[in-house]
């Protein structure tokens, strides 16, 4: 016990020693002379009247957002261009946010809209921002290492159709105290709310006590719950001098009662005890009673497609509803900027490694934060890996197709280039052709950065296809027109093919729906049954 206490003390001290101090000038850009005339992005003004922004304490700021609508022009000179749409104007409680992202020259922010200044007793209020649902907890992300500025939104976009909740975000351009700070992403955060995670606050007993909670696997930041189990190597051996830490995100630890703290700790402990047991794979009594398996699979595939070297061990947010609604833990995607081939460390630039198998590398490199042992256990359960492969095949027939991903990248990057946002951001924060931590590849310009991202994703998908047994040239049974979906359009095309024998764009191998070696009216019957929710013969 004393050894654990000493270790935690050393970790806390090391964090304090490396954390950079706030600066009175609020970290202005290298070039403070960049200005906006007009832009297709919303314009966000923050004014703190020269007051130093802090990391751990909020200050009062004034915020104004001009947003004339998607695709419309926004003008910075509101006198010359009166009558523009004000998306929000009022006070906010502002502070810096982030861990590794806070170490960059350009800082991300957390803010909460207020009814009046903090000095006058202001309280947070829920507002709708840039078309995103009302809430009182927001962030301004500052993409810096990712010079394409699309990775975070790209990961969210691809995960959103599969996961219950994935925070949304919008590009904007930011002024702070009249100085242009560049392109930011105004985002929802992982929090409780009608338009976020619709969770009840936990009560004191019974079913009310069992939800809702938001926790996070992350760094040691007191207070934390320390797992009873150490992380493991790729062969399953315990790494006894490393620990897994769970942070309390909602409710905040100081707002929780003793009963609530004890409950969520005991629930995590019960889950981990089950994973550590010899019969953890049992469908009825094993880990499946504690986690939403498909949600964990979706989370894993999102992290692996991006080859996030921080995955599972940092920003590992998960939540739990009340038992009467759903007793299982579910993961939420967050912090996806150092992904898709950026990091030089831990093999993050490579396309042919699994992130969930990084513990050996992390330990050798002296990293203090390793992946919880349950991800090792999951990926050594044949039933889980079979579901993982099936889900990957679903992804590949849906939105995780190279051409669709390239279209999303083109759409996101197009927003940034259409009216000069990149051309303003780049001189404010000059980086092209120079090293920016932790990039393994050094892009020479924006087109080069986008080209590298596309090539990396293409290679990553090909490798994952090979590892997970998916043949991109094969067509799913019933997908007669080969569009990746099975619906009434396939029924129509199959009927036309049977009647005429020469319909174009027919995938004959996918048309033998009853798998008897012939394509005839019986296949139409089988296909209609499947489209209506049945199963194949």
Model segments located where?
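Structural recognition of the beta-strand scaffold that forms the well-ordered cores
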Residues: 108-112, 136-142, 149, 157, ...
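Sec/Tat signal peptide C-region and signal peptidase I cleavage site
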Residues: 17-21
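Internal "kinase-insert"/substrate-recognition segments embedded within catalytic cores
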Residues: 112-118, 126-143, 163-167, 179-301, ...
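Zn2+-dependent metallopeptidase catalytic core
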Residues: 63-79, 150-164, 262, 266-276
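Cellulosome-associated attachment modules in secreted, modular CAZymes
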Residues: 470-537
């Amino acid at each position: 016990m004393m050894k654990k206490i000493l270790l935690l003390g050393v970790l806390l001290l090391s964090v304090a020693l490396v954390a950079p101090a706030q600066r009175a000038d609020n970290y202005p850009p290298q070039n403070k002379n960049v200005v906006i005339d007009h832009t297709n992005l919303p314009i966000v003004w923050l004014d703190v009247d020269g007051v130093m922004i802090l990391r751990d304490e909020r200050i009062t700021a004034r915020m104004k957002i001009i947003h004339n609508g998607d695709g419309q022009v926004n003008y910075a000179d509101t006198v010359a261009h009166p009558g523009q749409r004000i998306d929000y104007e009022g006070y906010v409680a502002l502070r810096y946010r982030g861990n590794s992202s806070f170490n960059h020259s350009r800082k991300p922010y957390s803010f909460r809209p207020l009814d009046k200044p903090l000095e006058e007793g202001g309280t947070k209020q829920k507002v709708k921002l840039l078309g995103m649902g009302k809430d009182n907890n927001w962030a301004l992300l500052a993409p810096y290492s990712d010079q394409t500025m699309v990775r975070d939104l790209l990961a969210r976009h691809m995960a959103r159709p599969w996961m219950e909740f994935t925070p949304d975000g919008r590009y904007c351009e930011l002024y702070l105290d009249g100085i242009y700070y560049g392109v930011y992403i105004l985002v929802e955060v992982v929090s409780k709310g009608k338009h976020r995670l619709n969770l009840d606050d936990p009560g004191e007993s019974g079913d009310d006590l069992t939800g809702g909670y938001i926790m996070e696997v992350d760094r040691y930041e007191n207070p934390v719950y320390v797992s009873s189990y150490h992380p493991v190597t790729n062969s399953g051996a315990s790494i006894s001098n490393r620990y897994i830490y769970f942070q309390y995100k909602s409710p905040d630890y100081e707002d929780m009662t003793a009963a609530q703290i004890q409950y969520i700790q005991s629930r995590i402990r019960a889950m981990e005890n089950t994973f550590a047991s010899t019969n953890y794979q049992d469908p009825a009594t094993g880990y499946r009673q504690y986690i939403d398996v498909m949600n964990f699979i979706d989370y894993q595939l999102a992290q692996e497609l991006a080859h996030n070297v921080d995955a599972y061990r940092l920003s590992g947010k998960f939540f739990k509803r009340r038992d009467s609604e759903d007793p299982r833990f579910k993961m939420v995607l967050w912090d996806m900027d150092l992904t898709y081939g950026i990091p030089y460390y831990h093999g993050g630039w490579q396309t042919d490694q699994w992130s969930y198998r990084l513990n050996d590398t992390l330990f050798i490199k002296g990293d203090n934060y390793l992946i919880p042992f349950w991800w090792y256990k999951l990926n050594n359960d044949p039933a889980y890996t079979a579901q993982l492969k099936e889900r990957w095949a679903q992804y590949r027939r849906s939105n995780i197709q190279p051409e669709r991903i390239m279209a999303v990248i083109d759409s996101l990057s197009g927003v940034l280039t259409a009216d000069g946002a990149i051309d303003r951001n780049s001189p404010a924060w000059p980086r092209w052709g120079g090293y920016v931590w932790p990039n393994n590849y050094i892009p020479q310009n924006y087109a080069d950065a986008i080209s590298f991202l596309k090539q990396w994703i293409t290679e990553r998908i090909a490798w994952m296809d090979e590892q997970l047994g998916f043949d991109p040239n094969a067509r799913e049974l019933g997908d007669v027109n080969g569009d990746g979906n099975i619906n009434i359009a396939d029924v129509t095309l199959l009927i036309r093919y049977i009647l005429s024998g020469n319909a174009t764009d027919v995938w004959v191998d996918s048309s033998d729906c009853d798998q008897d070696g012939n394509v005839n009216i019986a296949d139409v019957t089988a296909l209609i049954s499947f489209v209506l929710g049945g199963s194949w013969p």
